[in-house]
């Protein structure tokens, strides 16, 4: 069973009590400590407990529920008031105590130094992950590298350290992990970390902090006002590029290619619907096992009653290039809007491997693959229904049935991290563009480009108007195209919200109109995917009784919340979904420190605006 080692680790941690609940929990007995730390097997088993912090198998496929281009029927966590000084609940340190306990006690000389250092490297990688999550969530926090065994320990009452201190320790931990983790080959189903995980994660961390310092330099979250001078944005971009380059030059990974595209399936989507991790590219993953019913992507994305009906917005889907590398326009020369079939034709192949395209087929109950349009009856609010994590067999749809492994880190991200860091530094060469952005576009079937979008071998020299309007305030054409590539390649992989935060761009979530596909006409049966069969009947008066296609009531206009609106345009109607309350005040970029925590430790400072 693919996840047996992680399960064993979780059971061991629970049975021995090493995952402490509080920072000042009672110390373990010397006998139990010696039992674990006197042999490599004990270190290995303890180290499995670190993996319990990873996304669950049930949630890993929908970590991007909160993002700008995702339309859904709830704001759930993004709205003003979603977290307050009285409701913030993520100020938890038990996972850190578990790691620090290991590091303090892994000193038994019965185990060789190299073996101890290997497991210390794994522990420090997970400590870096813990602190990066805290930095993204709260900004500066106290740095703690010891176990508190005394409630009177004065260090329990420390104030926050600066971002410099935190990011410096994270970098130190990741450097140590890279140097001392002995596993350098691809691991089984990529469920166990290796040294390349540390290097790739360093590129992610440094890229985040570099962008945060650049794009938040003049707002109320300005890092300069918190005593940060050790790391500049430029230095952090350099560190991000160097870490990514280490993986690119020395690691065992490459882009997965070779599967020809057909009916919504190809090399790109292989990465997300394979029952065994595609380890040539996927560097770290959550494994699932169908017999245990662990995955639920189909249930979450294809159910009319479960999940928030997350789907893509039209504004985002228009960023996908044409297959020849030219920008896409959703209008004809006469100004009329293109149909959904036209939207899906001759586009970047990731379009039809992320949402149901016009050529998409599913395996029905009889075992036959049949053309399948988006399901408008409670499943999709825009017509751009996700397939990226979804198995194509309808048998997976009801309950936790998915057995496809779920990537947490891919080599593609490393390429994008490198390209962005170099672009921000003004150093990305045509050769580097070709081995990063060009390689990703080539896998997506793109054959060329323009001076504005770049080709497969040359970076752009002028800004393409649509992507420039998408990211106002950014004028560098190379940075803009790298962002286009990043948002498309990594869509729905849990990175988008952090990207918006570091770019100071969460207003994109506020301003996306949440429009959907073109509905050519109301009150008439429509063939939405062009297969010759009617799929839907959108009505603003009375439903139709024919059960061979869906009947969907809509409101003509754009003034209704929480219902399907349709907006009159040249050539028909655009679907539109409204949800009141989309705002993003500046303070929202950081969570508040919970009031109860400040009451316990008055030396902690509240974040700006809270």
Which residues are covered by each model-predicted region?
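Membrane-proximal, proline-rich intrinsically disordered regions
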Residues: 21-62, 324, 328-331, 338, ...
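Short coil/turn linking the two alpha-helices of tandem helical-hairpin repeats
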Residues: 135-137, 142, 205-217, 424-427
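Bacterial Sec-dependent N-terminal signal peptides
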Residues: 2-5, 13-41, 170, 203, ...
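Flexible, polar/acidic helix-loop-strand segments at domain edges
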Residues: 281, 336-411, 606-610
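Long, intrinsically disordered, low-complexity segments
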Residues: 21-23, 92-95, 169-171, 249, ...
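Short coil/linker segments at helix-helix boundaries
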Residues: 140-163, 212-238
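Conserved, well-structured interaction surfaces
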Residues: 35-44, 49, 54-55, 72-138, ...
């Amino acid at each position: 069973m693919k996840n047996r080692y992680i399960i064993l680790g979780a059971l061991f941690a629970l049975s021995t009590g090493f995952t402490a609940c509080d920072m000042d929990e009672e110390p373990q007995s010397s006998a139990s400590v010696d039992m674990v730390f006197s042999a490599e097997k004990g270190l290995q088993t303890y180290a499995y407990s670190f993996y319990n912090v990873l996304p669950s198998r049930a949630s890993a496929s929908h970590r991007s529920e909160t993002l700008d281009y995702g339309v859904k029927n709830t704001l759930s966590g993004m709205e003003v008031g979603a977290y307050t000084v009285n409701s913030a609940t993520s100020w938890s340190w038990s996972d850190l105590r578990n790691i620090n306990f290991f590091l303090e006690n892994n000193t038994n000389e019965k185990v060789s130094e190299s073996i101890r250092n290997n497991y210390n490297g794994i522990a420090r990688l997970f400590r870096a992950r813990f602190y990066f999550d805290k930095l993204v969530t709260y900004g500066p926090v106290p740095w703690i590298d010891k176990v508190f065994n005394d409630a009177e320990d004065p260090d329990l009452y420390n104030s926050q350290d600066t971002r410099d201190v935190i990011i410096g320790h994270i970098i130190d931990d990741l450097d140590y992990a890279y140097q001392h983790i002995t596993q350098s080959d691809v691991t089984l189903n990529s469920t166990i970390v290796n040294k390349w995980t540390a290097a790739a994660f360093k590129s992610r961390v440094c890229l985040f902090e570099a962008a945060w310092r650049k794009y938040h330099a003049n707002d109320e979250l300005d890092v300069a006002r918190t005593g940060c001078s050790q790391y500049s944005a430029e230095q952090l971009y350099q560190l991000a590029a160097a870490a990514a380059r280490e993986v690119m030059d020395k690691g065992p990974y490459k882009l997965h290619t070779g599967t020809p595209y057909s009916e919504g399936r190809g090399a790109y989507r292989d990465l997300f619907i394979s029952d065994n991790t595609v380890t040539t590219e996927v560097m770290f993953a959550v494994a699932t096992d169908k017999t245990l019913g662990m995955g639920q992507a189909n249930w979450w994305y294809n159910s009319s009653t479960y999940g928030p009906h997350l789907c893509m917005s039209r504004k985002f889907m228009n960023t996908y290039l044409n297959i020849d590398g030219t920008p896409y326009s959703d209008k004809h020369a006469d100004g009329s809007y293109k149909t959904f079939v036209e939207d899906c034709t001759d586009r970047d192949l990731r379009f039809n491997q992320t949402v149901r395209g016009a050529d998409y087929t599913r395996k029905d109950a009889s075992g036959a693959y049949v053309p399948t349009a988006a399901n408008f009856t409670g499943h999709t609010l825009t017509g751009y229904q996700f397939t990226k994590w979804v198995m194509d067999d309808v048998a997976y749809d009801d309950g936790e049935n998915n057995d496809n492994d779920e990537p947490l880190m891919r080599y593609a991200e490393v390429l994008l991290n490198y390209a962005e860091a170099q672009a921000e530094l003004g150093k990305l060469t045509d050769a580097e563009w070709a081995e990063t952005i060009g390689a990703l576009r080539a896998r997506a079937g793109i054959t060329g480009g323009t001076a504005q979008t770049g080709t497969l071998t040359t970076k752009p020299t002028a800004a393409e108007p649509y992507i420039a309007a998408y990211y106002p305030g950014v004028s560098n054409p190379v940075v803009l195209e790298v962002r286009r590539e990043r948002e498309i390649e990594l869509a729905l992989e849990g990175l988008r919200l952090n990207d918006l935060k570091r770019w100071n761009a969460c207003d994109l979530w506020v301003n996306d109109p949440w429009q959907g596909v073109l509905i050519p006409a109301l009150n008439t049966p429509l063939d939405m995917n062009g297969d010759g069969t009617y799929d839907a009947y959108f009505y603003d008066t009375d439903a139709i009784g024919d059960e061979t296609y869906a009947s969907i009531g809509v409101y003509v206009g754009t003034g209704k919340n929480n219902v399907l609106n349709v907006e009159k345009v040249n050539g028909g109607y655009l679907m539109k979904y409204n949800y009141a309350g989309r705002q993003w005040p500046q303070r929202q970029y950081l969570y508040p420190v919970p009031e109860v925590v400040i009451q316990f430790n008055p030396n902690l400072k509240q974040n700006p605006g809270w």
